[in-house]
Amino acid sequence: MTRKLFGTDGVRGRANTYPMTAEIALRMGAAAGRYFRRDSSIAHRVVIGKDTRLSGYMIENALTAGLTSTGMNVLLLSPVPTPAVGLLTPSMRADLGIMISASHNPAEDNGIKLFGPDGFKLSDEVEAEIEALMASDIPLAPAAEIGRAKHVYDGLFRYIERVKSTFPTELRLDGLKVVVDCANGAAYRAAPEVLWELGADVVAMGVEPDGLNINLGCGSTKPEAAAAKIREVGAHVGICLDGDADRVVLIDETGQVADGDQIMALFAKRWADEGRLKGRTLAATVMSNLGLERFLADESIVLHRTAVGDRYVVEAMRAGGFNLGGEQSGHIVMTDYATTGDGLIAGLQFLAEMVRTGQSASTLAHNFETVPQVLKNVRFDVGAAPLDAPAVQAAIAAGEERLTGSGRLLIRKSGTEPLIRVMAEAEDEALMTAVVDDIVGAVEDAV
């Protein structure tokens, strides 16, 4: 059974345009309700969270209508980070968790992510079954069994307490000035509150969401503003989250950015030294830098490569019994603490290292020399298949041959946007850039 709607992180697209329409959300809610309510002898419930996008309310209402029409009870959260849904779904004994978010994408986009009763994202197979149900005639509940919907007003505060509980109780953040950029997204209340309650001097940015400014010139994909603020106020460190707060990048006191690879390198070494790194293995995607792989090898730590997408990182972690993984983009997954990437928890663990060791962010955050890497994206029309074009395949083959023995090449279709991503790594930057430019040119000609 194959998936067409679902990508690497649920369903995503431009709001009010297929597939992110109220009609599709309604059918998805009904299909998911039907799937999880197959045993009608017990009450069933679903938790729904959302970020701060204007379209989130439309999609939330459509999902709620679909779910309740099949007899599911719906628990509605205020805007919360994605990991809060992963936490609260099992806590509230729900069959299903839903997060309405397009993560780091612009406000015009939105998405739907599905979580199982254990708080982990649903497998490809379950998503495929739900998608198949969407195309079928879905039986509705009798009038007396229609589900109910209610708001859960303390969900965000339950999440805040959980995040704080991951910070060592013997440590405090007193004397530490922290810039936190919440991307005008889901963590705009939680992140400053957590840091303040733990004692930090908090300089908050991106905490004025208006429904249209999420990720706009801020957050983990645009850390320049936070870097400037750090230099302006003399902060010790910066934490930049994305729109749903499941990814993070850090900024040291000089304004230099540390991506997910650098963050994972620090945690992997510390945990390995302490005997906490299960299997002495880090799970990361094929996008992670070769420099990370070399650093881990020097520390006798195994790098387990996965497909792109934090869900595939988590699947590999669960299959192998590992407890640390993530992506270069900033998804940091620590299954000792959470079921999915949690930017705020990852940021707190970094602050704990600063306090525990007395070392600066710049000392802790840059553990290896990155191999030069270039990544370029080419947008294409939905439904097109530029990678199938003979000229593109020839350019890829030529690039692979030129980089043989001196670098690596990765070309893939994004699972969340209509983009072809062309990435190369090599010590010879001129060669690497030329290879990428040739392939990008061929893809652009094909679209």
UniProtKB/Swiss-Prot annotation:
Organism placement in taxonomy:
Bacteria, Pseudomonadati, Pseudomonadota, Alphaproteobacteria, Rhodobacterales
The protein's matches in NCBIfam families, at most eight in alphabetical order, are given as: glmM, PRK10887.1
Major enzyme class: isomerase
- Cofactor(s) of this protein: Mg(2+)
Q: Which organism is it from?
A: Jannaschia sp. (strain CCS1)
Q: What GO CC terms are in its UniProt record?
A: cytosol
Entry keyword annotation includes Cell inner membrane: no
- What is the name of this protein? Phosphoglucosamine mutase
Instruction: One Pfam family, please name it.
Output: PGM_PMM_III
Which positions bind Mg(2+)? Answer: 103, 242, 244, 246
Record's InterPro entries? A-D-PHexomutase_a/b/a-I, A-D-PHexomutase_a/b/a-I/II/III, A-D-PHexomutase_a/b/a-II, A-D-PHexomutase_a/b/a-III, A-D-PHexomutase_C, A-D-PHexomutase_C_sf, A-D-PHexomutase_CS, Alpha-D-phosphohexomutase_SF
Q: What does this protein do?
A: Catalyzes the conversion of glucosamine-6-phosphate to glucosamine-1-phosphate.
TM stretches of this protein: none
Q: Please give the residue positions where the record annotates the modification Phosphoserine.
A: 103
Family per record: Belongs to the phosphohexose mutase family.
What this protein catalyses is:
alpha-D-glucosamine 1-phosphate = D-glucosamine 6-phosphate
For this protein, what does the record note about how its cofactor is bound? Binds 1 Mg(2+) ion per subunit.
Active site, per annotation: 103 (phosphoserine intermediate)
Name its GO BP terms in alphabetical order.
carbohydrate metabolic process; peptidoglycan biosynthetic process; UDP-N-acetylglucosamine biosynthetic process
